[in-house]
Amino acid sequence: MKHLTEEQKLTLDMVRDVATREIAPRALELDEKSLFPEYARDLFAKLGLLNPLLPAAYGGTEMGVLTLALILEELGRVCASTALLLIAQTDGMLPIIHGGSPELKERYLRRFAGESTLLTALAATEPAAGSDLLAMKTRAVRQGDKYVINGQKCFITNGSVADVIVVYAYTDPEKGSKGISAFVVEKGTPGLVYGRNESKMGMRGSINSELFFENMEVPAENIIGAEGTGFANLMQTLSTNRVFCAAQAVGIAQGALDIAVRHTQDRVQFGKPIAHLAPVQFMVADMATAVEASRLLTRKAAELLDDGDKKAVLYGSMAKTMASDTAMRVTTDAVQVLGGSGYMKENGVERMMRDAKLTQIYTGTNQITRMVTGRALLFP
């Protein structure tokens, strides 16, 4: 495991302070009222955190995957929805970074430089295309100097608030995975219709929207890469995203563990703090062990991505699976440690438990990530 640089340490100290002072006090309200974290968006923009992977060539800070993973862990510790804001922002930018032409990058990436508050989204999931993304029904037909897109997407994070959306659609359905293309779509494009924002179990401070495309015309120059390269582009983005999901999950688990530990030291039963009870000690020990193991695996995956190592896909899938399962288990155990208090909203752990569930689902369910891991090991 690499030692953190002084710059990374300073960034983390700053993020930890912001998370504790500015983000944590707002977490309960975001959850209860299902509010989009506009305050965090504006604050991150001023601090240079909203677009951490934006290349320096386009005015960005280009922090790297490991640094962003560390940031997401700190944010996830106090408010998973706010961490998801940065993950969604990165999701909509990575496809352009990975596959966009120099002209496309110049036209769009530079808009996110400085203190820009513009938001992005990635639109791939459909009602009939979740784990099986090749089942998507959205179509893009070339007509002269434009593409006409028809179809719909669902559960799109940042969907209704994004200024720039990367949309995946079939340009040649007969070619399967090599028939999918990706397009940059701007907010306000005629034919882009917004459906409902979903009411969710957890991560309620994040917006997930339905999007409909009704003869939506997109300039041909807005295609990302060549026709048919969209699926490979999407897989590359998801491989990176899984590490960020893992980091977020580690943060959620750490936050719940911190609350549980404090409670065991303060809560007195049978004449002494419950920290003295062996069953409680065993629970906390297992929780802490799982959190630290997940943290180390996640950081290893992030380092491999930064190094361009081919094993990053394998480690990213393992990290996402382990960290999200850990988050679900640790938050559930934290509720148990707190007992009746844990079931009440004011203590935060029940929110963390609801938030943790999503980490087992998005960027590929844990069943899918186990398949990715198994295939990478058995069919290298």
UniProtKB/Swiss-Prot annotation:
FAD binds at residues 122, 124-125, 131, 157, 365, 367. Transmembrane segments: none annotated. Its EC number is 1.3.8.10. Pfam families: Acyl-CoA_dh_1, Acyl-CoA_dh_M, Acyl-CoA_dh_N. Cyclohexa-1,5-diene-1-carbonyl-CoA binds at residues 131, 178, 242, 363, 375. Belongs to the acyl-CoA dehydrogenase family. It comes from Geobacter metallireducens (strain ATCC 53774 / DSM 7210 / GS-15). The active site is at 91 (proton acceptor). Cyclohex-1-ene-1-carbonyl-CoA binds at residues 131, 178, 242, 363, 375. Its cofactor is FAD. Induction: Expression is 3 orders of magnitude higher during growth with CHC than during growth with benzoate. GO terms for molecular function: acyl-CoA dehydrogenase activity; flavin adenine dinucleotide binding. It catalyses: cyclohex-1-ene-1-carbonyl-CoA + oxidized [electron-transfer flavoprotein] + H(+) = cyclohexa-1,5-diene-1-carbonyl-CoA + reduced [electron-transfer flavoprotein]. Homotetramer. Changing residue 241 to D: Shows decreased activity, with a shift towards C3,C4- versus C3,C6-dehydrogenation. Gains a low but significant C1,C2-dehydrogenation activity, but the C3,C6- and C3,C4-dehydrogenating activities are largely diminished. InterPro entries: Acyl-CoA_DH_CS (IPR006089), Acyl-CoA_Oxase/DH_mid-dom (IPR006091), Acyl-CoA_Oxase/DH_mid-dom_sf (IPR046373), AcylCo_DH-like_C (IPR036250), AcylCo_DH/oxidase_C (IPR009075), AcylCoA_DH/ox_N (IPR013786), AcylCoA_DH/ox_N_sf (IPR037069), AcylCoA_DH/oxidase_NM_dom_sf (IPR009100). Keywords: FAD, Flavoprotein, Oxidoreductase. Signal peptide: none annotated. This is Cyclohex-1-ene-1-carbonyl-CoA dehydrogenase. Acyl-CoA dehydrogenase involved in the anaerobic degradation of cyclohexane carboxylic acid (CHC). Catalyzes the 1,4-dehydrogenation at C3 and C6 of cyclohex-1-ene-1-carbonyl-CoA (CHeneCoA or Ch1CoA) to cyclohexa-1,5-diene-1-carbonyl-CoA (CHdieneCoA or Ch1,5CoA). Also able to catalyze, at a lower rate, the dehydrogenation at C3 and C4 of CHdieneCoA to benzoyl-CoA.
